[in-house]
Curated annotation (Swiss-Prot):
A matching Pfam family: Globin
Protein task: Phytoglobin that reduces nitrite to nitric oxide (NO) under anoxic conditions (e.g. during flooding or in waterlogged soil). May not function as an oxygen storage or transport protein. Has an unusually high affinity for O(2) through an hexacoordinate heme iron because of a very low dissociation constant.
Record's subunit section: Unable to dimerize.
E.C. number(s) listed in UniProt: 1.7.2.-
Keyword Lyase (UniProt): no
Short sequence motif named Homodimerization, residue ranges: 38-42, 108-120
Name by which UniProt lists this protein: Anaerobic nitrite reductase AHB2
CDD domains: class1-2_nsHbs_Lbs (cd08923)
Name of encoding gene: AHB2
Keyword Cytoplasm: yes
Length: 158
């Protein structure tokens, strides 16, 4: 994969919006997973912390930790895209992410569900500050992170 053009402005938009969301992680973690289940109710079975629950648990530390990881890694990816022109995640981290997603039964369309939930959560959290530029920056960063994980999953399969 060649170098990706990710601007300083895009990086700043991702970082600034993440700072806003970080101020109420419990709320936005819950919103994020509620969105995933609204878009794809069957996805519930992919998350160990959701399987045995009829609703998204409010005070589940695993739920919060997973949501934070998705947002934080996407934010870090934005920084890497701007600085390096590519996703720079440690091989061991990518191997782990590829392995865990493969074992959990995650397939390509699931990444789109997570992306849509991520964007809906950003829209909810940012209110009037959410716009096409913010959406585009987060989308591009997330797409590259998802591609890196999917590539690792394919390598693990073969």
């Amino acid at each position: 994969m060649g170098e990706i053009g990710f601007t300083e402005k895009q990086e700043a938009l991702v970082k600034e919006s993440w700072e806003i969301l970080k101020q109420d992680i419990p709320k936005y973690s819950l919103h994020f997973f509620s969105q995933i289940l609204e878009i794809a109710p069957a996805a519930k079975g992919l998350f160990s912390f959701l399987r045995d629950s009829d609703e998204v648990p409010h005070n589940n530390p695993k739920l919060k930790a997973h949501a934070v990881k998705v947002f934080k890694m996407t934010c870090e990816t934005a920084i890497q895209l701007r600085e390096e022109g590519k996703v720079v995640v440690a091989d061991t981290t990518l191997q782990y992410l590829g392995s865990i997603h493969l074992k959990s039964g995650v397939i390509d369309p699931h990444f789109e569900v997570v992306k849509e939930a991520l964007l809906r959560t950003l829209k909810e959290g940012l209110g009037e500050k959410y716009n096409e530029e913010v959406e585009g920056a987060w989308s591009q960063a997330y797409d590259h992170l998802a591609l890196a994980i999917k590539t690792e999953m394919k390598q693990e399969e073969s």
